[in-house]
């Protein structure tokens, strides 16, 4: 019925299957090394589980940085138009024109030089690694807001022509009240969907950056560092492949779960999706 047609049924079934598989893995790990051990004898499943924390931290903190920028600039650009719209469009067009990996890599390499020159500011290697992780989140945040900003601008351009917005302006309602009470609630479904999709993209971005050597500190457990270490182990005879497989499986599962959640959010909050389900 409506739950099946909206995709919520499939999301629930897939979520139950994923939870069942991971619960079985965690229970079995009490007795066996499910994914084997690393070259120094560490349990690969434990490394993979701890890497989830790094992925969630990067996704969450990066979203905290990028979301306010995207929302404020996006709805202001679409609502006010003219000069403000031109300036904001110029900013996000310029940022989008620069290849993302090159921009982030250059910023992270500059950060590494800065951390090396001020190593005495940190009392331990853990503090330096945490600062590097935080700054990577900051860099990803200030460079990753453009796509959401563009979508919010387009949606705001349509909403500002609605009758209730025109009536609010006629009654003398301030622009700030219109933005906060009328426009922002009507674009939140886009914000939620894109935020969840971008979360999975950030997990993949961390893996790519760590693989090429400009990601989190090598001492920090992450899927990117696991894949980078497994690359050398794959050249052995016999090849040690299970560390690579574990990182890939967990990364794939997290990205899949995020996309399934995004579909559920879209089905729940997108007015067009609701109308399609009701008419069918």
Regions found by a protein language model. Give the residues of each.
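Transmembrane alpha-helices
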Residues: 1-31
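Short pre-catalytic strand/loop immediately N-terminal to key active-site residues, enriched for Gly-Thr
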Residues: 34
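Alpha-helical transmembrane segments of integral membrane proteins
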Residues: 13-14, 18-21, 37-280
């Amino acid at each position: 019925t409506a739950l099946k047609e909206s995709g919520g049924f499939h999301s629930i079934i897939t979520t139950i299957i994923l939870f069942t598989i991971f619960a079985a893995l965690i229970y079995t790990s009490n007795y066996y090394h499910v994914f084997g051990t690393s070259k120094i004898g560490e349990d690969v499943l434990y490394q993979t589980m701890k890497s989830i924390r790094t992925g969630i931290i990067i996704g969450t903190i990066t979203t905290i940085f990028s979301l306010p920028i995207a929302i404020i600039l996006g709805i202001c650009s679409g609502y006010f138009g003219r000069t403000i719209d031109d300036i904001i469009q110029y900013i996000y067009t310029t940022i989008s024109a620069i290849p993302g990996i090159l921009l982030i890599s250059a910023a992270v390499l500059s950060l590494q030089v800065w951390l090396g020159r001020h190593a005495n500011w940190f009392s331990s290697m853990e503090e330096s690694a945490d600062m590097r992780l935080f700054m990577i989140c900051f860099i990803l945040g200030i460079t990753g807001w453009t796509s959401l900003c563009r979508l919010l601008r387009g949606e705001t351009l349509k909403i500002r022509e609605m009758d209730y917005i025109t009536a609010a302006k006629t009654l003398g309602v301030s622009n700030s009240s219109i933005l906060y009470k009328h426009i922002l609630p009507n674009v939140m479904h886009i914000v939620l969907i894109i935020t969840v999709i971008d979360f999975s993209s950030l997990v993949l971005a961390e893996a790519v950056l760590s693989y090429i050597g400009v990601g989190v500190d090598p001492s920090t457990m992450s899927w990117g560092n696991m894949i980078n270490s497994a690359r050398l182990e794959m050249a052995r005879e016999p090849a040690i492949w299970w560390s690579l497989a574990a990182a890939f499986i967990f990364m794939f599962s997290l990205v899949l779960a995020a996309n399934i959640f995004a579909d559920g959010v879209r089905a729940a909050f997108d007015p067009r999706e609701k109308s399609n389900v009701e008419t069918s």
